[in-house]
């Protein structure tokens, strides 16, 4: 069977990656809207309603507008929205199959799936299991930071790193951003973990194209019961047992580090996320490493599409 796919916003960073990852798949037919008609609502509506699957790779307002073009009674066309517009909307299913035991089936049956944000993906993979198991109290004063490649900033940021000639020292240095502490991923980070309060989140962009690590520090004395890093490693290993796209790394950090370092790029060009637990009796650091353009964006979207179409969820994806 051939499925018709329309990528609305095909020329953005995520749209291009989805297009690239779907290229050559015999069961997928990409519907291509003429360049001069991309912003014509009437023409776009024709493509949306002709498709089996629509990927929305657009700003929030444009995503909402595209969803509104679905014809009344059309229950066949299914949406995967890569924007932040619908991630906490009750009528949309959150597109993280590994979230809990029932999430994959919810995605399979959904007409509208919201693809998680990249930073949020890592934070939720770490904190949702811990909060739902009662290890981390819901009112825990959570904080998190992430370092990501500049491709996560879209075309303008990519150009600032790749087309500006020789970079100055400020651009070579890792740079904190979203210092107003109101990053757009925060609502889903709270909603999908069960935390009573938004975490204090400090993202960092680095002078490398893609790859990321999201880290969450934990103080055992503030947790619901005493745990060590090895306990959390075992907990994660059990929680994510059987998950193809999430791998829990060994408790002994030496074999999984590079001379003591944890590089952000080791999962690039895959749809794999790696979970780590480091620390000692008084302090723990849990971390998730993955490709911000893979499990953090286009790979996650395609994984969900595969599930929705009843295909092997890793079809077309490297893990």
What are the functions of these language-model segments?
Residues 9, 13, 118-125, 180-187, ...:
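Conserved active-site and cofactor/substrate-binding residues in soluble primary-metabolism enzymes
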Residues 177-181, 204-207, 263-267:
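Short Gly/Pro-enriched turn/cap motifs at secondary-structure boundaries
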Residues 17, 65, 125, 129, ...:
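Alpha-helical scaffold segments in soluble metabolic enzymes
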